[in-house]
C-alpha cells in the first residue's frame, strides 16, 4: 500500500509540475501577444508589406517583404541594379536570382518547408497550437544584459528555433535557428530592436540584424509598414519559363 501511495504521490507531483510549466509557457506567450498589440489585433492581421534598407558589407540595399497570412511570403532585394526574388507559399516556393542565371527556380521541398514560418506575420507564438507548433520553456538565459525567457519552438514539420523574450517588455529580442550557407550548416541568429507601434496599434521591430554563423551579418532597417494592404495573389505564382 505504501508503494502505491508513493507512486500516486510521485505521479501527482509530475502532473502538477507539467501543468505549472504549461501554464508558464502560455502566460509568457499571452503576455508577448498582448505586448505586440493583443489577440484582437493579431486576428485582424491578414497581410503586411514592409519597405526596408539592408546594410551588408558597407552597401545599402533596398528590399521589401510582402506577406499574406498563412498563404504567401515574397521578398525582393535589389543588388547591382538587379532584383532577387524569393517566394514561399503554403504549397512550396521558388526564387529568381539574376546572378545565378535569372530563370525562376523551384525551391527544394525541404528548404521551402523550413521557411514556411515566414508565411505568418503574426509569428509562430500566436495561436501556436492551431499552427501545429509546440512551445517549451527552457528557463532563462542571458541575451546581452537581459535575462530572457528561452522558448524552444518546434513546428509541425519538426523545424526547431529558439526564441528569447525580454521579461520586461515581452518582445522577442533574439531568434536562433539552424540553416545552410553554400551547403555548410550554420547557426543563424536574428536580433530584433527598435520596437515601434504602428498607427494601427501593432508593435514591430524596426531594426533586424541577421548573423550568418559569424561569416557575415545583415542589418535591415524598416522604413515603412503597410498593414492589411490589398495583395494580388499572382505575385506568389512562379513565372513560366
What are these model-derived regions, one by one?
Residues 21-34, 41, 95-159, 179-186, ...:
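Flexible, processing/modification-adjacent segments and terminal tails
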Residues 26-101, 136-137:
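N-terminal mature ectodomain segment of secretory-pathway/periplasmic proteins
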Residues 45-47, 70, 130-132, 146-148, ...:
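Extracytoplasmic
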Residues 49-53, 76, 94, 140, ...:
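Residue-level detector of beta-strand face positions
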Amino acid at each position: 500500500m505504501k508503494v502505491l501511495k508513493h507512486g500516486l504521490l510521485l505521479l501527482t507531483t509530475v502532473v502538477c509540475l507539467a501543468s505549472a510549466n504549461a501554464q508558464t509557457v502560455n502566460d509568457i506567450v499571452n503576455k508577448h501577444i498582448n505586448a505586440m498589440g493583443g489577440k484582437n489585433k493579431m486576428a485582424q492581421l491578414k497581410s503586411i508589406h514592409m519597405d526596408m534598407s539592408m546594410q551588408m558589407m558597407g552597401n545599402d540595399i533596398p528590399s521589401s517583404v510582402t506577406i499574406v497570412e498563412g498563404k504567401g511570403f515574397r521578398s525582393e532585394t535589389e543588388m547591382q541594379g538587379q532584383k532577387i526574388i524569393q517566394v514561399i507559399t503554403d504549397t512550396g516556393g521558388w526564387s529568381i536570382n539574376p546572378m545565378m542565371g535569372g530563370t525562376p527556380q523551384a525551391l527544394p521541398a525541404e528548404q521551402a518547408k523550413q521557411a514556411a514560418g515566414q508565411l505568418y506575420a503574426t509569428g509562430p507564438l500566436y495561436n501556436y497550437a492551431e499552427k501545429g507548433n509546440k512551445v517549451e520553456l527552457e528557463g532563462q538565459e542571458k541575451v546581452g544584459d537581459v535575462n530572457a525567457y528561452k522558448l524552444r519552438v518546434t513546428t509541425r514539420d519538426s523545424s526547431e528555433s529558439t526564441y528569447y523574450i525580454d521579461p520586461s517588455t515581452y518582445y522577442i529580442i533574439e531568434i536562433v535557428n539552424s540553416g545552410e550557407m553554400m551547403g555548410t550548416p550554420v547557426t543563424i541568429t536574428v536580433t530584433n530592436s527598435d520596437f515601434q507601434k504602428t498607427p494601427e496599434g501593432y508593435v514591430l521591430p524596426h531594426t533586424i540584424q541577421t548573423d550568418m554563423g559569424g561569416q557575415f551579418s545583415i542589418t535591415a532597417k524598416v522604413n515603412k509598414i503597410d498593414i492589411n494592404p490589398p495583395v494580388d495573389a499572382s505575385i506568389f505564382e512562379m513565372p513560366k519559363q
